[in-house]
């Protein structure tokens, strides 16, 4: 994973948890040539949903990407997460 900068932001998605959802989300980014720097996905306890956190570049296309993500059938909610984007570096250290 690359070093994060102030130009990165975390998007938090709540999605329906079933096979293929991650493919739809990542496919949207791929089709728009919008790089995802980091991904974390965890199921929501006692639910059929999951949270996906995406570390992405905060550029002029981001608002349009958020709008497109929100239109995906299995996305229940998408928002900017106010956490420090460097949390992805801390997670990476854990797995090294």
Swiss-Prot record:
Its EC number is 2.2.1.6. Disulfide bonds: none annotated. One of its GO terms (molecular function) is acetolactate synthase regulator activity. InterPro entries: Acetalactate_synth_ssu, ACT-like_dom_sf, ACT_dom, AHAS_ACT, AHAS_small-like_ACT. Keywords: Amino-acid biosynthesis, Branched-chain amino acid biosynthesis, Transferase. One of its GO terms (biological process) is L-valine biosynthetic process. Residues 10-83 form the ACT domain. It is an enzyme of class 2 (transferase). The keyword Iron does not apply. It catalyses: 2 pyruvate + H(+) = (2S)-2-acetolactate + CO2. One of its GO terms (cellular component) is cytosol. The keyword Lipid biosynthesis does not apply. Pathway: Amino-acid biosynthesis; L-isoleucine biosynthesis; L-isoleucine from 2-oxobutanoate: step 1/4; Amino-acid biosynthesis; L-valine biosynthesis; L-valine from pyruvate: step 1/4. PROSITE patterns: ACT. Belongs to the acetolactate synthase small subunit family. E.coli contains genes for 3 AHAS isozymes: ilvBN, ilvGM and ilvIH. PANTHER family: ACETOLACTATE SYNTHASE ISOZYME 1 SMALL SUBUNIT, ACETOLACTATE SYNTHASE SMALL SUBUNIT. Dimer of large and small chains. This is Acetolactate synthase isozyme 1 small subunit. The gene is ilvN.
């Amino acid at each position: 994973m690359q070093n994060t900068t102030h130009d990165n932001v975390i998007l938090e998605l709540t999605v329906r948890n079933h096979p293929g959802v991650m493919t739809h989300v990542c496919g949207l980014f791929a089709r728009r040539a919008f790089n995802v720097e980091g991904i974390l996905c965890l199921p929501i306890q006692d639910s059929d949903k999951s949270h996906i956190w995406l570390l992405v570049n905060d550029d002029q296309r981001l608002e349009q990407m958020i709008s497109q993500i929100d239109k995906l059938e299995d996305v229940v909610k998408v928002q900017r997460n106010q956490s420090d984007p460097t949390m992805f570096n801390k997670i990476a250290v854990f797995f090294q």
